[in-house]
């Protein structure tokens, strides 16, 4: 090797190692009392704070996170949106990639910081997301994003400014909050025989209040047509904005169980008690970055579907689920539990204090949430600006509705990947039909016709280490197996199971890989293949510019109309990956399935420290 070639090799190795630095983090998980909305309860703290610390890394960093469980209950940490390529043992899913971290023990997660973008981490043990273990992750990219920003502005100064703003964004972790712990909340449903999903607050960065604007006000804030289309005439919400718990349209059925609404404690469904506390304040500086600011939103909600807007400010949505998209300008956007959004805002309004409106937009409850975006130096000024959303998340004008992002279906969700990235056309190599819905009780949910995914499924013998443990057992109905290098279609059907003809949305998240949503339509799936469906209903498919994400929404079905969705992905990351609804009540009730991707190339060289 020549001296020059040797020098080039040394330089290349230097820059590779510079990019791939090792970053060590420590997370200490404790159980303490707190009052994020002004009302005390016990919750999870991470390193003494709630929500958990924001973690910022560079693409391809070698990450080592040591988690100390200092609670009296089990825990794991899932790195939501990270692909865990070649490190499935660090995904953080009990029963699939590890055993739960028991009280007093620790676990070391090791993985590459990949892919770049806006992600988050959270607990994955039972319903403990309700208790507060969640935080933002930002992986700064190595690649050039000029082509992304130039779709927003052709000005070179703007392009440079947006790159700087995206490198150092504001983080907004949005969560819903209940006065009850996860164990208490679930017990209310099982004791009463009713699925209960009434909340108390929307929090931003762990801060919020309990609002009690009155029953008449909340009734007037219902989404137009919701009661007429979905509920009996005259249905009224409570003074917390919640629908009556014993409505058949809410609970489904009939089920062979006893309904005991009298066992729902006071203040769960009604009996609102207001509390003044504080809302999050985001201070922005229009003198920096040519007046551009980037905001990373994490929907760490457990039930709610969040809408967000900033009074008088439009924004460019440029990233969803850690995937860059061709930017589009909106005044409000809806995001489902589990999703992450990144937006770019031009600070071109009169300096002042502007309300950020972040209500629950779903049909589950009328519930407002707020934060403040304050221009630097205007912290003590009165609020200014024009509202785009009402307290309950309704657009304040037809023009607002026209310029809002709704992820309901193919014809309204036009957020195509940047740079272009589309799946293989035609038939996939494998197709799996999954029928979603309730079985046996209002709180029992399945992803495969009848099988309920237990909260402790394979906890003692995780499938990464025992991939054949469920064969020849009934539990094999909770497992799908795919081959490495194959294209897979997951066909999800809702509103066809007995007793579940009216179905709320499900927020479906797949670990280990993102999926393209290539199809969405009404009716019962009765096609022999996806290719046949494409030929018969081409208007319901998009294989040229479909979105690419790790969390997708299914349809809100009213009055027995069935819906289906088709998601396509490529298998190149062998391991056991959970596919589940990100509504905590639904996952707790059984809405999950284990996908063993690449069983013919199963990981063999698992580090000894992870061996079970």
From Swiss-Prot:
The keyword Hydrolase does not apply. Induction: Expressed during isotropic growth (swelling) but not during polarized growth (germ tubes and hyphae). Expressed exclusively in the later stages of conidiation and in blastospores when M.anisopliae is living as a saprophyte. During infection processes, is also expressed by appressoria on the cuticle surface and hyphal bodies inside the insect haemocoel. Cu cation 2 binds at residues 80, 122, 582. This is Laccase 1. Its main location: other. One of its GO terms (molecular function) is oxidoreductase activity. Pfam families: Cu-oxidase (PF00394), Cu-oxidase_2 (PF07731), Cu-oxidase_3 (PF07732). Its EC number is 1.10.3.-. The keyword Repeat applies. Residues 1-20 form the signal peptide. The lineage of its organism: Eukaryota, Fungi, Dikarya, Ascomycota, Pezizomycotina. Cu cation 1 binds at residues 78, 509. Coiled coil: none annotated. Laccase; part of the Pks1 gene cluster that mediates the biosynthesis of an anthraquinone derivative pigment that contributes to conidial pigmentation that provides protection from UV radiation, heat and cold stress. The polyketide synthase Pks1 produces 1-acetyl-2,4,6,8-tetrahydroxy-9,10-anthraquinone though condensation of acetyl-CoA with malonyl-CoA. The dehydratase EthD and the laccase Mlac1 further convert the anthraquinone derivative into the final conidial pigment.
